[in-house]
Amino acid sequence: MVILGASGAGKTTLLNLLGGMDTATDGEIDLDGKNITSFNKKQLTDYRRRDVGFVFQFYNLMPNLTALENVEIAVEICDDHLDPETVLRSVGLGDRLDNFPAELSGGEQQRVAIARAIAKNPKLILCDEPTGALDYVTGKKILKILQDLSRERNKLVVIVTHNAALKDMADKVIKIKSGRIESIETNDEPKSVEEIEW
């Protein structure tokens, strides 16, 4: 799923609502049969821990921890997590496990952030402009990882972006304008990331 809109349209706010980071003042948000707007603080914390993985534009890695340790620390709060080393290898970082963030490129740091989100084994992965700070080639690699995650592991991946070209990779596109959902479109034939140009 892609949430599309201009800067300041409300995309990140919607993402934060879906992730239980903000609370709605009106209406309901139903995910997987649960109305998360009715959750108390403990339920929201449990929801964020168990059901949601976050990938932000800026990676929020712990600078004094290695790539492996950055993923391991995230899974300490999860019951049904995946093996951190296996996940890092799956995103192409098997030879960078013991490197600190300062020793990694921007694309490698973003892959650590994605591995951290994947390793929690959440139902929902929320990505806020995951390619915004990356070059074209690295951005496509990151999007491919996310698309494969959705297709192969049956996870709901939500990508927030202002890049209209990315709508072609999604099965559902939500367009946001001035803090409101302008439209919800279904794409019966999403393209693979390799076919998309911007």
Tell me the role of every PLM-derived stretch:
Residues 172, 180-198:
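Conserved beta-strand-loop-alpha-helix hinge in the C-terminal portion
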